[in-house]
């Protein structure tokens, strides 16, 4: 069991962040990939991580995630949503998944994109995906989403999973709104599948 150390200045530092770049650096310093439940940390790659996500995880508020110092992509996207919303940015939160029934081995992901206030270009803000960390800028929103899609395909392929055209064609991308605090793993997914906007076909036409 990991001991959760609370930094008394952490929330003050978060509240003083002025730019997306500062938010990224804050998350680099204070947010690690994993989930914390009742003082115990479950880390990516460990045997108990996936089971804990499916059975024990509950969505915390962005401030509680910051306090714990741990979050997987679903959690970290809520920190990002909180900051970009409070600072009046145009942004979207997105969920990408291979829609395969029965024992789906493919990894899903959530992330945020936003419009830069200086040049109106769209940026993919990525902290949870360690292979693609950073702020990546594109001319359009569609370019940002399609670039992330290609990286998502690459990552799943790196896990030695089959990546045929038929498999790629199962990818769906949803634009989703803030889920309910306290949501279980299944409730989080149900919120997306029942309420989110499926933008897959729209993107395919533009790619």
Language-model segments: which ranges?
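A structural boundary/capping signal
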Residues: 1-207
């Amino acid at each position: 069991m990991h001991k959760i150390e609370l930094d008394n200045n952490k929330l003050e530092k978060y509240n003083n962040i002025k730019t997306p770049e500062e938010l990224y650096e804050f998350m680099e310093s204070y947010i690690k990939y994993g989930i914390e439940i009742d003082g115990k940390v479950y880390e990516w790659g460990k045997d108990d991580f996936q089971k804990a996500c499916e059975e024990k995880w509950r969505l915390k508020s962005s401030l509680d995630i910051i306090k714990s110092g741990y979050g997987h992509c679903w959690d970290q996207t809520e920190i990002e949503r909180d900051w970009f919303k409070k600072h009046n940015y145009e942004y979207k939160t997105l969920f990408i998944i291979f829609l395969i029934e029965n024992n789906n081995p493919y990894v899903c992901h959530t992330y945020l994109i936003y419009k830069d206030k200086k040049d109106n270009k769209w940026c993919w803000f990525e902290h949870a995906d360690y292979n693609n960390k950073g702020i990546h800028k594109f001319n359009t929103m569609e370019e940002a989403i399609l670039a992330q899609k290609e990286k998502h395909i690459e990552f799943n392929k790196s896990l030695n999973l089959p990546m045929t055209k038929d498999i790629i064609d199962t990818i769906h991308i949803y634009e989703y709104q803030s889920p309910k605090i306290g949501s279980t793993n299944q409730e989080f997914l149900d919120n997306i599948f029942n309420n989110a906007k499926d933008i897959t076909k729209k993107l395919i036409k533009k790619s």
